[in-house]
């Protein structure tokens, strides 16, 4: 029963974390920047935001973004962080699909528990790789951006990325280390048989 609960917890945690990583990858509010001194920017109400795909300016209620489409002039760290976040987002899809197939409520014929166990282990490894890619990108980007411009604060995209990466790391570790062995993945299968002298149904465990 404990192993079953941990499998579900690992799946839910990983799924929420993966969504956070996708949000981080697709949005541009990674860091809030200032082209002048911070007091001047606050007085002029002019702040910017920098992300993987665009540089944006917020001034007097207006929000304008300039897409970063010229790959040849982009800093190397931006291109590397793009690659890492895209890889993290892509790795999440097979990991979540594999976890779906090993949930206790999912049955794929009469497969042995060891097959589910191997898929769960593969999903756990993918989730940890996902988390590492996201963590490297979301730490590397603000460090390098700080060398180019003044950073006022971190944006919601970075926070979503950090939370998502940590959740995926926790989910992957739970699946790998705490969700049981091959027997635990095979013991939660049930079938129902009709009683010979009673209209009620008895539940029998099938290991």
UniProtKB/Swiss-Prot annotation:
It is a multi-pass membrane protein. The chain crosses the membrane at residues 2-22, 83-103, 123-143, 158-178. It comes from the Eukaryota. Plays a major role in tight junction-specific obliteration of the intercellular space, through calcium-independent cell-adhesion activity. Its main location: other. Belongs to the claudin family. Interacts with tetraspanin-3/TSPAN3. Interacts with OCLN. Residues 1, 104-122, 179-207 are cytoplasmic. It is found in: Cell junction, Tight junction; Cell membrane. GO terms for molecular function: identical protein binding; structural molecule activity. This is Claudin-11. GO terms for biological process: axon ensheathment; bicellular tight junction assembly; calcium-independent cell-cell adhesion via plasma membrane cell-adhesion molecules; cell adhesion; spermatogenesis; tight junction assembly.
């Amino acid at each position: 029963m404990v192993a079953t609960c941990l499998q579900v917890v690992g799946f839910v945690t990983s799924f929420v974390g993966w969504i956070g990583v996708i949000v981080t990858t697709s949005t541009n509010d990674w860091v809030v920047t200032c082209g002048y001194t911070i007091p001047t920017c606050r007085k002029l109400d002019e702040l910017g935001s920098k992300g993987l795909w665009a540089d944006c300016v917020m001034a007097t209620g207006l929000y304008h973004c300039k897409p970063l489409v010229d790959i040849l002039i982009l800093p190397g760290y931006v291109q590397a962080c793009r690659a890492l976040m895209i890889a993290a987002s892509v790795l999440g899809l097979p990991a979540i699909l594999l976890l779906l197939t090993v949930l206790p409520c999912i049955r794929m014929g009469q497969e042995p528990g060891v097959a589910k166990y191997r898929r769960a282990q593969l999903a756990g490894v993918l989730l940890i790789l996902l988390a590492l890619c996201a963590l490297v990108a979301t730490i590397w980007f603000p460090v390098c951006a700080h060398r180019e411009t003044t950073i006022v604060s971190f944006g919601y995209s970075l926070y979503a990325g950090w939370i998502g990466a940590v959740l995926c790391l926790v989910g992957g570790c739970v699946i790998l280390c705490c969700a049981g062995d091959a027997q635990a993945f095979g013991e939660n299968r049930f079938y129902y048989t009709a009683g010979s002298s009673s209209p009620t149904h008895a539940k029998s465990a099938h290991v």
